[in-house]
Amino acid sequence: MAYDLHGSWENKIGHHSQYRPHKDDPVGDIASTNYAVQYWTGKGLPANKLVFGMPAYGRCFSTNVDEPRVGDPATGASPAGTHTKEAGFLSYYEICDKIENKNWKVRYSSTMQAPFAYGEGQWCGSGFKTISY
């Protein structure tokens, strides 16, 4: 599983599907897909037996920080999406809508090798840079 590494159940912002860990990641190096792959292959599991699940959604936080980043305080889950109707969770298309119509900013962390977006007091980690729309 290469997702749900973080979420609104935590009190600090964390990317739920980062490839590499961020230095300010609240749980350290273990919250990355690279760590999971290295762990299992290190235990003897052949790499060709691994199935790598990728998310088409974002785990999202509410925050009071103007330009939020991993490790910043979260005030809770982001509001529920129009279609998904679950706090702290936005579908890929709901994130795209926020980027296109609500002027959310998109950033890419070369450290985590993962994209994220933020705006309107919310922060979402997702795979939208790696999936074209």
Please place each PLM-identified region on the residue numbering.
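Non-cysteine beta-strand/loop elements that form the S-adenosyl-L-methionine
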Residues: 1-6
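Loop/turn elements at helix/coil->beta-strand transitions in domains of secreted/extracellular proteins
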Residues: 45-51
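Glycan-binding loop/region signatures in secreted carbohydrate-active enzymes
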Residues: 8-20, 24, 54-133
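A Trp-anchored, charged/polar loop motif used as the substrate-binding/catalytic surface
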Residues: 26-41, 132-133
